[in-house]
């Protein structure tokens, strides 16, 4: 076996593997032997079927298996010898072995760019001193109250107001004709939370339960739905219900429902929770300063496939949001051309990938590794947060290949932790 390894770019390589006719024949015969071992055919004893008969019967399967298995072995051997770690699936030519003929196959793959690392030890970074105020504790307790609040129907004869949860049917009309897709039944929103256009909320506030109202809703010129941008649409609405939140009292019963002995213990736990979160945020901000400072000192190419995959994912998420059919929602997302969307997605992708690539390359330099149990622990925590069955969640991650992205993420985290631990962290007052 001979091979030629070429660099197409700083992040892309091409590998050409060549085999002699004898090596091809040996590989084919090895697979034929596997097939004939337990094969029984009329006129032949088990395991004694001639090679030519076996190959004739299973030629396609044998050829494919011999080619794939042999290439897999040689590729692994070459990668180990050349210390290569490909980033993504290998793109190989669709060729198979032919008996008594030489064989050549070319594959391309991407690798991390070579980075000349600046000094990353002993860097000084400022980190905010963490303090938790009584006001912040009170705000957290208020949020817990809201989470445990009971929604009840408003009994008095009144129109809805900010803070109320309303259930509305609506239809949009332009010049007396219904506007396509601008309609909905039992649209639920909390007034005053910018969950809908201001004109729509104001129209809802003019109605009482069971009443129908008509009014004009003006859509911003930069509204995400281009067919509605800048238009004034006649809306017919019907208010189905008004609900308001009844907050529980901050007393011993409330504390016990939240899982604590008394209200003082709940306040203490809330303060600890805030301290932990603030410390995590302060550390995260310090880490961002460190990595951004290091990235300013280096230039490197981002692997093309990695970049395009990330851009496609960002654009896909944008399309999902754009296709959600609540046409009365606020028009804060701007209408953008495809080119603008792509360019913005590229900027967003690079902001994520450049730190990740730098840290992955540093992890390789420092010989950092991610253990299997670390991956399993991360998957378990993710499943818990997503409220999904762990085994199903884990299987889905492995089947989709997302587990490899998770491994890269964990490796980058380890490298970032290394930089932070080697840094001179100076705590400063906010």
UniProtKB/Swiss-Prot annotation:
It is an enzyme of class 5 (isomerase). Pfam families: FKBP_C, Trigger_C, Trigger_N. It is found in: Cytoplasm. PROSITE patterns: FKBP_PPIASE (PS50059). Disulfide bonds: none annotated. GO terms for cellular component: cytoplasm. Its EC number is 5.2.1.8. GO terms for biological process: 'de novo' cotranslational protein folding; cell division; chaperone-mediated protein folding; protein transport; protein unfolding. Keywords: Cell cycle, Cell division, Chaperone, Cytoplasm, Isomerase, Rotamase. It catalyses: [protein]-peptidylproline (omega=180) = [protein]-peptidylproline (omega=0). GO terms for molecular function: peptidyl-prolyl cis-trans isomerase activity; protein folding chaperone; ribosome binding. HAMAP family: Trigger_factor_Tig (MF_00303). PANTHER family: TRIGGER FACTOR CHAPERONE AND PEPTIDYL-PROLYL CIS/TRANS ISOMERASE, TRIGGER FACTOR-LIKE PROTEIN TIG, CHLOROPLASTIC. Belongs to the FKBP-type PPIase family. Tig subfamily. Consists of 3 domains; the N-terminus binds the ribosome, the middle domain has PPIase activity, while the C-terminus has intrinsic chaperone activity on its own. This is Trigger factor. It comes from Lawsonia intracellularis (strain PHE/MN1-00).
